[in-house]
Amino acid sequence: MIMNQEYIKVRGAKEHNLKNINVDIPRNKFVVITGLSGSGKSSLAFDTIYAEGQRRYVESLSSYARQFLHLQNKPNVESISGLSPAIAIDQKTTSKNPRSTVGTITEIYDYLRLLYARVGIPYSPATGLPIHSQTVSEMVDIINELPKGTKVYLLAPIVRGHKGEFKREIMNLKKQGFQKLIVNGEVCEIDDLPKLDKNKKHNIEVIVDRIVLDESLGNRLADSLESSLNLAEGITYLEIVELPPAVKTEFEKNQRITFSEKYSCPVSGFQLTEIEPRIFSFNSPFGACPKCEGIGKEFFFDRELIVPDQRISIKDGAIVPWGSTSSKFILETLKALADHYKFSIEVPFASLSQNVKDILFEGSGEEAIKFEFHDGSKTQIIKQPFAGIIPSLQEKDRTIESVLIKEELAKFKSEHKCTACSGFRLKDEALCVKIANFHIGEVAGMSIAALQKWFSHLEEKLNKKQLFIAERILKEITERLKFLMNVGLDYLTLSREAGTLSGGESQRIRLASQIGSGLSGVLYVLDEPSIGLHQRDNTRLIETLKRLRDLGNTVLVVEHDEETMYEADHIIDIGPGAGIHGGRVIAEGNAEEIKNFEESITGRYLSGRQTIKVPSETRVGHDNRSIELLGAVSNNLDNVDIKIPLGTFTAITGVSGSGKSSLMIHTLYKAALKHLETTSKVFPGKYRELKGLEYIDKIIDINQSPIGRTPRSNPATYTGAFTHIRDWFVELPESKARGYKVGRFSFNVKGGRCEACQGDGLIKIEMHFLPDVYVKCDICNGHRYNRETLEIKYKGKSIADILMMTVEDAMQFFEKIPLIYEKLITLNEVGLGYIKIGQSATTLSGGEAQRVKLAKELSRRSTGKTLYILDEPTTGLHIDDINKLLKVLHKLVDMGNTVLVIEHNLDVIKTADYIIDVGPEGGDKGGKIVVCGTPADIAACAESHTGRYLKQYLE
């Protein structure tokens, strides 16, 4: 008899579309929740079980602590018992902050900083030799090189960039007889110090001695140095207050020389004041490169963005930031330049000489130009150098305070590696410290796989003392690297920015971090961890999930992957359909048991009763026309040449990190877009040549970014259906009688919307210790419109009622109105019949947003010359939804278009006409074309990881 506490018992769950369901989830097991997209899987896993677990934990904290945390709303459920503390690892990407990297998220970089601080050896950038500490005698010799009569201060830096009031330290200095301090750059009497803010960082130096250098000093200098070094833990500053007049010297007034008993280069004078973890942090002023402030990149005004289309003339607006020279001042400036340098502003910019272009962009230097400015009857003549477009933009960027103007100027900027730190983000002081000939920036730039290999041989290169100090640090680093390898992220580098990671990658990084934490007794809720993962790496991911379970945790995974289902201890199938047609528990048990449930669509596919069929023949394309990309070398691409047959369904495959997105999105898509839309601000990866663009008229990347940033955007507005709905309402007799225009039926502008909630339908109430509460607007009752607008009805329904309809209901309602029906039927075709047409864009998942975009494309009149690119369109899709999606994609191809998908899903790959397999591995070992051809060709290639798994699907 199984005891009750062996289950998480959910009773009466009614969140979103869940239909009062009861479910028992085995504790300390690996459980998969599956079902069609929109069936209610996430509603059960995240919005009910995780939300309640998190809410109970937060409610147990003090009210003071709760105000700093986001409180989950209480889910619509009668009871949940047996619940553990819950941790959600979802698809939302990690921080977009450029300072957040793979190394900082996983904490490996923190251990690396500690390792370098404790066993790293500093080397002089000038000589390449190890840096040794200075003795007091060596310091005296350096000071004696200053001209006689030089007035200096000897300073002991007792506080360097720390917060506090330092009352005790100052009291001790008083007792020792010191009279003067330099506090935050100001010389102060010790009895008359400014009050220090304990929450701000301060610098305090003791003036140990004030000396005028001459022969008669004797031992005074050495004694003062020793006192200063003792006060400041081996560091002292010498500040040159005054140099003797008429003496030529390399030294300067107010110059500071740092002396350290620790590290200093006697040849170049390069010194390290400390080797502490903070100097290896690019998020600390003590470690960050001063030029790029730890970002590793510099931004500059780019000539190609300032003049994106050189085919037009200056007069017609070639210089984009200066507009179409409509400003009289700008036009007269350019005319004066043209007269002086003998060029025309009416010819294409490309035909101007390189010298003229350089002068336009960078200025005329010291050469003065005669400018005539006319203001009515007045004429002003000025003779001065021309500043140049780029220097004038830089000056404007530096002096302007308007955020809007700064954003406008940013459109003309590109980025490149910081020239000071070579993109490593750190000061020279940090980059001169090395272990086994590598500085920390070089180590962070290695792939996880290369890093694991480097660390496995590192022990041989450390001496006994270093090994003793580093033993525990090395254990922590190698453990974390192993976990990252196990979740298929061996191709990432520690320096990779978090904002550039896909949802699947960031989720697996957090998964690896959780295993590293070693927690037990926790409920982990994961959202499709297999996304973005090649079938080859899936086994390692499943083993990782099992290891998490074996630590004594309950692992609850929302997943569609068949292999994961077969390996799970228990499966809960939610369905049978999506939206209102879902929300019930259809089947429970292991994979074999699920197969026997007739109502379970998942069971039908697992048992083979229903399948995605392999096409009987493959398309060959349009008259052998193709797009050819030659010599692609961005990121890890190794001088790649590819040919994409037009009029086909082409799949780009390969293991994670092999270079698929670099090839298709960063190079092909951006290069084609730049050619087809000259004003687009995109930066393609490097390539030699792109041929065949004359055969297409547009290239569209249908990605998973939101269809809108505000709750006002919805599927009806995005697809254009709402425009036709509003037009229809305007034509109704009652609307005409009242004189209503189209704006009357918009919730974005004044007129017809409810002004109490400004068309949102909800009013936000801020709660101090609780989450913000959204309540229905009591004026419009959540309908968004005012009473007069809602009085206009079609078939008994107001415009607010129509926005609340699902796509399926709206199709039936408008079946006699072709303009509206055609927009809605495409939403249904892509499997979104369950969503409400007025559903807020912010509540749509990435997969749903992508399919709304696909529906919009389907509803357009096809030219048959469009190239569509989709990056993993199966994200978040059940196998039955994938079947529907494939019909839509093949329909686009049948209309004459070309569809290019980057995909790991073998059910999609097997239906492709043509496959380009990139690899063979990820990272440095990828970036090559392994094989191209039909699915049968790929399956026959022994070197292709994709081919090996695809073979089983073709049999």
Curated annotation (Swiss-Prot):
It comes from the Bacteria. ATP binds at residues 35-42, 654-661. GO terms for biological process: nucleotide-excision repair; SOS response. Keywords: ATP-binding, Cytoplasm, DNA damage, DNA excision, DNA repair, DNA-binding, Excision nuclease, Metal-binding, Nucleotide-binding, Repeat, SOS response, Zinc, Zinc-finger. Its main location: cytoplasm. Belongs to the ABC transporter superfamily. UvrA family. Residues 322-601, 621-951 form the ABC transporter domain. One of its GO terms (cellular component) is excinuclease repair complex. The keyword DNA repair applies. GO terms for molecular function: ATP binding; ATP hydrolysis activity; DNA binding; excinuclease ABC activity; zinc ion binding. It is found in: Cytoplasm. The UvrABC repair system catalyzes the recognition and processing of DNA lesions. UvrA is an ATPase and a DNA-binding protein. A damage recognition complex composed of 2 UvrA and 2 UvrB subunits scans DNA for abnormalities. When the presence of a lesion has been verified by UvrB, the UvrA molecules dissociate. A zinc finger (C4-type) spans 754-780. It comes from Rickettsia felis (strain ATCC VR-1525 / URRWXCal2). Pfam families: UvrA_DNA-bind (PF17755), UvrA_inter (PF17760). Forms a heterotetramer with UvrB during the search for lesions. SUPFAM superfamilies: P-loop containing nucleoside triphosphate hydrolases. InterPro entries: ABC_transporter-like_ATP-bd, ABC_transporter-like_CS, ATP_grasp_subdomain_1, P-loop_NTPase, UvrA, UvrA_DNA-bd, UvrA_inter. This is UvrABC system protein A.
